[in-house]
Amino acid sequence: MSEYTNEHFNNRELSWLDFNERVLEEAMDERNPLMERLKFLAIFSSNLDEFYMVRVGGLKDEVLAGFNRPEDKTGLTPKQQIKSISMRAQELVETQYATYKKITKQLSNQHVRFLRTKHLNKTQQDFVKEYFRTHVFPVLTPIAVDAYRPFPMLLSKSLNIAVEIASNGEGKKRLALVQVPSVLPRYLELPTDDEEHTDLILLEDLIIQFIDSLFKGFVVESTMPFRITRNADMPFHEEGSRDVLKQIEKELKKRRYGVAIRLEVQQRSLRKELLFMLQDVLDLHDRDIFIVDGPIDLTFLFGIYNQIGMEYDDMINETLIPFIPEGLESGKDLFQSIAKQDYLLHHPYHSFDPIVRFIVQAAKDPNVLAIKQTLYRVSGDSPIIKALTDAAESGKQVTVLVELKARFDEEKNIQWAKQLEKAGAHVIYGYKELKTHSKITLVVRILEGGVLQRFIHLGTGNYNDSTAKLYTDIGLLTTNEELAEDATNFFNWLSGYGERPSWHQFETSPDDMKDFFLNKIDDEIKLHEKYGNGRIVAKMNSITDRAIITKLYDASSAGVKIDLIVRGICCLRPGIKGVSENIKVISIIDRYLEHSRIFYFYQNGKEDLYCSSADWMTRNMKKRIEILFPILNASHKTYIKDMMALQLVDNVKARRQRSDGRYVYVKRETNEEEIQSQIIIHQYTGGRWNNIPSVFEREPSNWAEREVLRLRAENEKMTDD
């Protein structure tokens, strides 16, 4: 079928909201511990903030510019998308706050209470009064709003309190604003009579309790907390810039004061006159206003989880200790180990520590001549940055591509770039109009006799030791000569001038990766027509590229069996008769964020397997520098296939997409044991594969079940031996 209609696709933005709904489902899932559910509420809020700042902001820009062309998959115009987004987002936020109320009630039963000032006992009242006097009052600034003092330009995502006041001798009402200080904790832990109990109060409630102290001689008539979200979809103007770093620094200052795109107000404090005034000043449509039944901005729950949650073992997930492969343990010479064999690491089941030590050892090793690395997002106190700094200061040749345009990490990356340059590293920022999203490190080491040996790390995720504990990613440590040659040419291409090199093993975007994928799917179609065994399994964060989607539809129509594991946006619709009936799509949302990108093509038994920094998104194919690399080692292939096999039979955290685009939990059959893939993958990675669910005993009907059945047979054989 060559022509596909709008009904064969999901809209990108609405599909993202479906993903965030799946995040919200984790907060609603009573199988999860209470504090974990709180954390998912915070993740939902954080996700939605960024979505509005970037995606909705971009759509509003298009409307203001008079751009009303339908998008290329579902045919919705920017105006239609904004309307649909608003309706869906309002529904989800309403569900979020209903869930918040339910969870906080359950927490209260477990002696963790969120209190308002009227619920405090005498000791707590005295405590908050003193805290306000010594910690809060000195940093508050009341801002009058009148003809001579116009409504201020409030920072995006800052929490504020609108205050309606009247003088003692007048009936005339006046308006003032008080910003809730972001330099103070959002909540305060209160003294209790029992160490088993935890009582908390929010900073805005505490401020409102004593807000009259800011307006001597006036009576506070009403208060209304509110929060503005501003457009952060501000493209960097690189054309003609002599210094990209300085240009980006300049552009970043504008982001905090972009056009308002969303207003959140608290339902219990709602004052219609104040709301209408804010709506008028900010020039917002009714659909841009979110009236929430609880505290504004639930991202403060991250702090509750990290600080309070850790005190309650029964309210958080049991920690899964990551494994370290033999040969990469602390104290081992990593170069000696990697020279003997390639290592595949699957984070966070495998510790990220060997990757950090790989860079640290390279920085300290006198035989290392050069270190080259791409950095997209790193942690706040990055040991990798420190190691690269030390290496540069010791005289090693250090080349680092720091991506200054990594969304919301720009300021941090500018700081790292300056630090590395000061240390003597050669810092580059990539190509104009492209983001360098590749994850690659090259270490050049001299051996006895002057022979050079190259060590490479390739990955699907960032060099971020913090998120590596939460994101699932694949990493490869190798000395493979062809991969090493490709890595050398890749860095030379980034840092110098010249045409893109010819690769031995790599495929890269924006040049040839998309064509490579289209050709691989075409090959699978041809082989299926000849042998009848076509099979594609792909795992990624999102799929949006129309050309790849339609090529998958062609493959499905030809009879190729396709399984897609897509955590986030999925513009493809599976199960449509005559279009995608041979395609299945699942999404897994669990304790770890599924982040690895893996692509499997059966190829009539050849079984080609690749990992990449790229998703099947148009931006990855056209607007980013990405690397796709093959998995060549047979045991590594087996591990990755086994891992994907387990995910494809997950019946606890997997949701399948229906042909109408909606997601439902994978239904567990009667008497079928629970298969929570992330837990089982952890056991499998550690070699503890002893308890196989009985579901594997039925006749395998697809590639996934055949693979798991094979694993079970191997495990039983090992046990018998």
Swiss-Prot record:
Post-translational modification: An intermediate of this reaction is the autophosphorylated ppk in which a phosphate is covalently linked to a histidine residue through a N-P bond.
Catalysed transformations (reactions): [phosphate](n) + ATP = [phosphate](n+1) + ADP
Highest rank taxon of the organism: Bacteria
Keywords: ATP-binding, Kinase, Magnesium, Metal-binding, Nucleotide-binding, Phosphoprotein, Transferase
Stated family: Belongs to the polyphosphate kinase 1 (PPK1) family.
NCBIfam families membership: poly_P_kin (TIGR03705), PRK05443.1-1 (NF003917), PRK05443.1-2 (NF003918), PRK05443.2-1 (NF003920), PRK05443.2-2 (NF003921)
Reported function: Catalyzes the reversible transfer of the terminal phosphate of ATP to form a long-chain polyphosphate (polyP).
Cited PANTHER family: POLYPHOSPHATE KINASE (PTHR30218:SF0)
Name under which the protein is recorded: Polyphosphate kinase
Taxonomic source organism: Exiguobacterium sp. (strain ATCC BAA-1283 / AT1b)
